[in-house]
Amino acid sequence: MNDETTIEPTGSVDRVLLAAPRGFCAGVEMAIKALTWMVRAFDGPVYCYHEIVHNQRVVERFEAQGVVFVDDVADVPPGRPVMLSAHGSAPEVVLEATERGGFVVDAVCPLVTKVHHEVKVRAGKGYSIVYIGHDGHEEAVGTMAVAPDAIHRVEDVAEVEALPEFTEPVALLAQTTLSHRDWADVAAATTERFPDVWTPGRSDLCFATTNRQAALMEIAPRCDAVVVIGSSNSSNTVALERLARDAGCDQVFRVNAAEELPRDVDGRVALRGTVGVTAGASAPEELVDAVLDALAPAGGVEEVRITDEDEYFPPPRNLRDLITAIDRLASLGLGGPGSASTTTTDRAVPASSALGALS
């Protein structure tokens, strides 16, 4: 939110129930901080294959620092540094990026890497893989490319019923950012259709996605309206919006920022009573703060926390090694970016702070 932008408080909201956990997950934290390190370590431009995370404000913040987002690695000039997004990339994309000769950082979420590994192992053992995922979503596209001849993407029960009669064993895997509701019915239909289906010992569904959905379900029945903060191309954000509607909340609004809240003709926020607020896993906390300021609840804000999240994903190894080398050179008086600090600070500094420091 720009400092010069003033959001008119409403005075008509009684109170806000603020879901927790909300906002950045561990994978998004890692990816944003990794790209921040690259911006600080390299002379621009730094390139990024796809949006680093699915959030308009985050992408705009990096674009302001000269990061160039591309949807084809062929658009990256040879020798330029490039980051691959948190959603995971097809093996041929990783190979092409590497062959272009620049420094390549793969910021894929470790939970997505787990699914890629499962696909590779099951395909190698001769399984047909039923993969529950959204058509065209970058995570699904990258995962399916790991073993395109073995994997069959489905999104609903009808697509499960339309699958062929496999002669080989069947495995069931999923896009990590699905809602449990999206996954459960399709998984049940797959198990009914293929009773001997193999499933991983630990669910493919992201714990952060599940936590945010559970936190929303804790507050939604008590709310007159729910505001979900996040971008329309964020799968987990859209799932939160749909979940709030399924919970029976009549007024559900997905907004990129406070400026998009519904307004009365006089410009005031057109919400009343108790308003629930949550944010998708790619939405920075500054957007939440701006929405709370705009709602200005007379009875204050009550944070409803269902669990704590302390998971930490460190930067990719080659980036850690680069930053360590820069630190050592700087300590010897041999140059290097003065703003770069030791990687031991990475865990302590939240992505929102790292992102804000770029401004």
Residue ranges of predicted features:
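The feature marks the mature, well-folded catalytic cores of soluble enzymes
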Residues: 2-279, 285-359
